Swiss-Prot record:
Keywords: Aromatic hydrocarbons catabolism, Detoxification
Name this polypeptide is given: Protein BsdD
Species: Bacillus subtilis (strain 168)
Phenotype of null mutants: A triple bsdB-bsdC-bsdD deletion mutant no longer converts vanillin to guaiacol, the conversion stops at vanillic acid.
High-level lineage: Bacteria, Bacillati, Bacillota, Bacilli, Bacillales
GO biological process: catabolic process; response to toxic substance
Induction description: Up-regulated by salicylate via the transcriptional regulator BsdA.
InterPro entries reported for this sequence: VdcD-like (IPR047707)
Physiological role: Involved in the non-oxidative decarboxylation and detoxification of phenolic derivatives under both aerobic and anaerobic conditions, however the precise biochemical function of BsdD in metabolism of phenolic acid is unknown.
Note: It is not known, if phenolic acid decarboxylase forms a complex composed of BsdB, BsdC and BsdD. The term subunit is often used in reference to the operon, however there is no experimental evidence to prove the existence of the complex.
Length: 75
């Protein structure tokens, strides 16, 4: 498990791995659904350096009444 940079939960799981061994991995937090790549800068991957303005409290995800829809794909 990996620590989520956005909500600090310890529930980050590997979603995908690079076809080139060790180049990168993609993680997803099972608490807040944030995704990040291992190759991104520490300001994204390191919970201590993640911008506090974008941090969320995991308890708030339980009461979130509206989740933004994924926009339609443009042709």
């Amino acid at each position: 498990m990996h620590t989520c940079p956005r909500c600090d939960s310890k529930k980050g799981e590997v979603m995908s791995k690079s076809p080139v061994e060790g180049a990168w991995e993609v993680y997803q937090c099972q608490t807040c659904f944030f995704t990040w790549r291992s190759c991104e800068p520490e300001s994204i991957t390191n919970p201590e350096k993640y911008n506090p303005a974008f941090k969320i409290d995991p308890k708030e995800t339980e009461t979130a009444i509206e989740v933004p829809a994924v926009p339609e794909r443009k042709a």
